[in-house]
């Protein structure tokens, strides 16, 4: 693929075209289905834009919490096992902050218009 436009820019352009040009022309259930598709494209755009950085930050926090290295999925499995075994809990230094930041990062991708998420961003 060429350097410009990027994959993210292409997906955003398609979503914007559908939202601005096609949605107003469609009614009823088909308009609803089209909006679902547009929302999926918007989610993919956010995933491509935000996920790499938030995943790297999550992995760094997990490495510090657990004292081990590994892939993000393996680090999360290790944390889950330690929580299930009672080896770590919310009193463990850094765990609550890690869980909160991970949740906020995931909401930024999945549900950026979620009222509680937006309210929490406003509290910072």
Predicted regions and their residues:
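C-terminal amphipathic alpha-helical interaction region
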Residues: 4, 8-14, 58-124
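Short, charged early-sequence alpha-helical segments and their helix-coil boundaries
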Residues: 47-63
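Non-transmembrane, amphipathic alpha-helical segments
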Residues: 2-6, 22-29, 33, 64, ...
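Short alpha-helix boundary/capping elements
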Residues: 39-49, 70, 103-107
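N-terminal interaction modules that seed assembly of large macromolecular complexes
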Residues: 17-47
